């Protein structure tokens, strides 16, 4: 009974919030907030799983309960019902819609009461399904639920490293056209079976998120790679050539690394010369990185190094490196579609681990602002150190810094801190102009962030600095939220 009591309290909060004109936060946020407020002992994951399902089916359950007259005969004590309407809703949900189709509690008066109505409840549920012309109620809510959790576009890029013999992409594109027969002019026009040719990134295409691609032979053989469009920005901005040597400082899972390789090797490489050094601190993530590199067909040309980039890579050891991609751990606030359970399993920021962690953006509603700012400050300090370390390499001429964060603390303000740093100025680094950073992309950096620091416009032009940065909004711009800036040396 303890679980249903706890879940009822949380459901009461959700119902109150839903009655407002504007709901503050998601279901995940509301569940976590209530669990914290009441100091509940029940597992928040379990509460969320039940309430998420119960809330979706609530209108149907209420109709069934009304028809079965279960709310009319509730026993009373001193004129008040003994059983809560919402607790009964939860029990009816588990009896009718849970996987086990049973109430998860021992002997209790409320359980006995609900089981008295078992037959009429089942009967009314069958009638409702017949009336709605469905076999299961899930048919009515599944499509909406899935669409809310999917990206607006599934982006795929052709991998020239697997396009034999000369990196020709046309045969792969011809195969894609067989599956996706309708070409659309805008990604927002995508429907199942259609394809969009991206205007910003070469060999990148958008398909409808419901279209299955992972079973396709092109995907299995590494000829196409699923990668969000914004995630393709760093390699495209860096645009390294055959003579460049690149370090990807935080490489896993490897999409940016292999995308970078496609610029150095526009066709399958004919030698085993290492041109990219990929660093990953976490050994398990490094295994994923190695697997992705192998699938992409560039294992001989990428050296995977397991360890902290700032400690393992020294300017003396890598004195010939010319280009860097620095995409360090960030708040992840630009990522959408992450399930509630991820918030319990993500890496936390540990005082002993400068690799940072991930802070789910949806938790901002109930994590104290002071705590969030502390986390962002720690992340931005780590990000600053990562980029500054890359800037210290003697042959470095170009660095792309990126995050999947929407917070200025991790984006424009890191750029500002670097520009104000004495060593960075002495090394001759500056923000690359707009013409070198996907100039046709419409959404640029926040000029107001630069105006706060460079008001005089003499040291740096705030407008030019903002235009040298790229931002992408979650979903609105066709994918994840993202930030990218390119530094180049005078």
From Swiss-Prot:
GO cellular component, one term: nucleolus
A single GO BP: rRNA base methylation
Keyword rRNA-binding included in the entry's annotation: no
The reaction(s) this protein catalyses: cytidine(2278) in 25S rRNA + S-adenosyl-L-methionine = 5-methylcytidine(2278) in 25S rRNA + S-adenosyl-L-homocysteine + H(+)
Subcellular localization: Nucleus, Nucleolus
Binding positions for S-adenosyl-L-methionine per the UniProt entry: 250-256, 280, 308, 327
EC numbers for this chain: 2.1.1.311
Gene3D superfamilies tied to this protein: Sun protein, domain 3, Vaccinia Virus protein VP39
GO molecular function, one term: RNA binding
Keywords in alphabetical order: Methyltransferase, Nucleus, RNA-binding, rRNA processing, S-adenosyl-L-methionine, Transferase
Phenotype reported upon loss of the gene: Altered structural conformation of the ribosome in close proximity to cytosine 2278 (m5C2278) in 25S rRNA, leading to impaired translational fidelity, and promote recruitment of a distinct subset of oxidative stress-responsive mRNAs into polysomes.
Database matches in Pfam families: Methyltr_RsmB-F, NSUN5_N
Primary localization class, coarse: nucleus
Broadest EC class assigned to this enzyme: transferase
Top-level taxon: Eukaryota
Active site, renumbered: 404 (nucleophile)
Role according to the record: S-adenosyl-L-methionine-dependent methyltransferase that specifically methylates the C(5) position of cytosine 2278 (m5C2278) in 25S rRNA. Loss of m5C2278 in 25S rRNA results in anisomycin hypersensitivity.
Quaternary structure, from the entry: Interacts with TRM112.
Misc. remarks from the entry: Present with 922 molecules/cell in log phase SD medium.
Family the UniProt entry places it in: Belongs to the class I-like SAM-binding methyltransferase superfamily. RsmB/NOP family.
UniProt protein name: 25S rRNA (cytosine(2278)-C(5))-methyltransferase
Species: Saccharomyces cerevisiae (strain ATCC 204508 / S288c)
Taxonomic path: Eukaryota, Fungi, Dikarya, Ascomycota, Saccharomycotina
Name of the gene this protein is made from: RCM1
